[in-house]
Amino acid sequence: MQAAIRQSEWDQCAVHYEHGPSPVTYVYRRGPSSQQWQPWVVVAESAILRRLGRRGLGLYAGRAFTEGQYLGKYEGALVGHYDTRRDALTAPETRRLLRRGHDKLVAVRAAHGPGFDLLDGESAGPPYLQMANDPRGTRLHSNVELTDAGWMRVTRGRVPAFSVDKSLEENINSELRWDYGDDYWDLHTLLGTDSTHAIEVD
């Protein structure tokens, strides 16, 4: 499945959404051996952030996903290579980027050799995994995880597809959410950038 996702083609279109302030973006995937496009994820205003009194975008399931299925691999500009994940998240360049509002920084195990690569997903393309928010501060739990290698995988039984016929609050179980980890939030505390700023996605 991971190899097929890597070789996928992606397309997207804006769809009118009467329950929100702006259209939502449906992202479609076509596998290497398929002729058909299928909805994969949806970028829309985040129901999680709304619950926290904030505004920003979030990532939703465009089709139903079940536990163990992969959505894609986290991509982004390579910031640097480090011996450990903590080294990556506490490096001087990481702090500089965070102070400039780059909050899509993720450390993943290096594809070639030991150590970790720090990726800045700020301008990454489809399937826009960097848009997934952390549910910290709400009563919601994560429904996906990011593996050491940077693959986003469903961890709860079933994530239903986003529906344009439902409100954002009614779609909240479709929003993809993962725990960024204590190291991520500890760094924001150290730098004086509060959690509210850190999780906001523009």
Predicted features and spans:
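Short, flexible/disordered secondary-structure transition segments
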Residues: Y17-G20, G72, L187-G192
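Short linear sequence elements within intrinsically disordered, low-complexity coil regions
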Residues: S22, G31-S33, V79, D87, ...
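Eukaryotic intrinsically disordered, low-complexity, charge-rich
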Residues: M1-H19
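Catalytic cores of histone-lysine modification enzymes
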Residues: H16-Y17, T25-E145
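C-terminal SET catalytic tail plus cysteine-rich post-SET Zn-binding segment of SAM-dependent SET-domain
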Residues: I5-S8, R136-D202
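Intrinsic disorder/low-complexity segments enriched in polar/charged and small flexible residues
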Residues: Q12, P39-V42, Y74, R153, ...
